[in-house]
């Protein structure tokens, strides 16, 4: 069962619009060797991928202005970073700025005294961010995290050329999705690319399906630690729908060997081997980086997740994460902490970062951007994703970030086994209910 501190913010981190307009970015690439942070000097770790250049530019700008107090930077692939930061936090060797997803993990950092209270110290940067996204960085009303990049809804991408070639309607309902799966599968095309090796992309299916079928309150019961919360019929129905997709060949036969870190899931779409991809908005940057002509030629379409006939959830609801966050390590010397806070106020999400994010097709977690997209190469996508977030009646933080680390890992383990056909929904429910008593 989760500690009360992990449920204190924004109704258990199930985020409601208009109280939230916001969105787990994940990077691709290779892992450098990396070392622990020093308490006496500024250091930062972040993710490889499309946004790495923006972070490097920001910290280099700080370094040029502060040559006696420079940041050392290291970048890691998403899955490698999560393992490395867990070890560094536990050993007291975290970098000065701790890259995180808020939610249950940040609450654990707070409970263990691993990060510092930033309340009243980062008002300058919070003043330019979307207020509700800034609130996600709070634990028990105190500010421990500051948004550092873009809002990230989970979006259904599709290869428009393949849809036109096979006369398939972009799916806005579950029945239309299953029809598309059947058509593409019969044509020898993988209907939906899925990075099953990374496992966390599979969460997007159970999150959206549970919300579409049962509404946002279903997961809130699990967040609140209610007995047998995972026995809700909507969760069982969501799992049955996942099995329906797998059995229909929606993900092909090799999804268990596809990695999101390497961008292989997006590559299957832009090379025409797969028709669709359910992934976060950050993957748009991957498409632009790896297949610029594919994007420029209008071959990438995007939709919200399809509605479920008779479902209790609002089809405009969104899942994902509000943004990523910087927290300041409690292990750093006090004067180093103050320098990190100065960076956050003066350089983080400033105009230069905003312009850089917009240029790559990412939406910074900054207020008042509605008129900023006109004339940009990525205007259609930026407007779609920004409106998707702002107009969502409810936005659910990704379950693996909303939950504490132990039940989150159990969730990932059991969900992977569902996709691989190793367990049935009743076994998943039993296993997850057991985490409520742990």
Mark where each language-model region is.
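C-terminal capping/gating helix-and-loop segments adjacent to ligand/active sites or protein-protein/ligand interfaces
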Residues: 138, 147, 223, 360-370, ...
């Amino acid at each position: 069962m989760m500690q009360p501190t992990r449920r204190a913010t924004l109704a258990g981190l199930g985020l409601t619009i208009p109280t939230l307009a916001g969105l787990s970015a994940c990077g691709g690439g290779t892992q450098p060797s990396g070392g622990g942070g020093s308490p006496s000097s500024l250091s930062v770790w972040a993710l490889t991928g499309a946004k790495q250049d923006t972070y490097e530019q920001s910290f280099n700008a700080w370094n040029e202005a502060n040559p006696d107090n420079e940041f050392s930077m290291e970048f890691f692939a998403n899955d490698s970073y999560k393992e490395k930061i867990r070890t560094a936090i536990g050993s007291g060797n975290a970098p000065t700025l701790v890259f995180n997803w808020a939610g249950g993990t940040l609450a654990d950092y707070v409970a263990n005294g691993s990060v510092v209270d930033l309340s009243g110290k980062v008002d300058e940067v919070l003043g330019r961010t979307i207020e509700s996204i800034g609130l996600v960085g709070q634990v028990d009303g105190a500010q421990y995290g500051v948004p550092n990049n873009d809002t990230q809804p989970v979006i259904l991408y599709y290869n428009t050329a393949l849809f036109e070639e096979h006369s398939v309607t972009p799916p806005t309902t579950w029945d239309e999705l299953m029809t598309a799966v059947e058509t593409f599968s019969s044509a020898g095309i993988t209907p939906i690319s899925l990075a099953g090796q990374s496992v966390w992309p599979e969460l997007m299916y159970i999150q959206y399906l549970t919300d579409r079928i049962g509404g946002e309150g279903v997961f809130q019961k699990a967040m609140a630690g209610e007995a047998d919360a995972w026995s809700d019929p909507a969760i069982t129905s969501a799992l049955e729908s996942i099995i329906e997709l797998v059995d229909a060949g929606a993900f092909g036969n090799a999804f268990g060997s596809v990695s999101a870190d390497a961008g292989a899931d997006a590559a299957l779409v832009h090379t025409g081997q797969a028709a669709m991809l359910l992934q976060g908005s950050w993957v748009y940057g991957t498409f632009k980086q790896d297949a610029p002509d594919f994007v420029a030629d209008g071959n990438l379409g995007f939709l919200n997740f399809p509605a479920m006939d008779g479902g209790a959830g609002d089809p405009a609801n969104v899942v994902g994460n509000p943004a990523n966050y910087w927290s300041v390590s409690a292990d750093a010397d006090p004067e180093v902490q103050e320098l990190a806070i100065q960076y956050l106020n003066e350089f983080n999400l400033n105009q230069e970062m905003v312009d850089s994010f917009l240029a790559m097709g990412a939406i910074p977690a900054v207020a008042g951007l509605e008129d900023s997209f006109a004339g940009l190469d990525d205007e259609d996508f930026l407007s779609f994703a920004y409106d998707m977030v702002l107009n969502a009646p409810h936005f659910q933080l990704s379950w693996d970030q909303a939950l504490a680390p132990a039940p989150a890992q159990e969730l990932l383990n059991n969900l992977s086994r569902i996709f691989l056909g190793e367990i049935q929904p009743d076994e998943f429910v039993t296993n997850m209910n057991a985490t409520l008593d742990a």
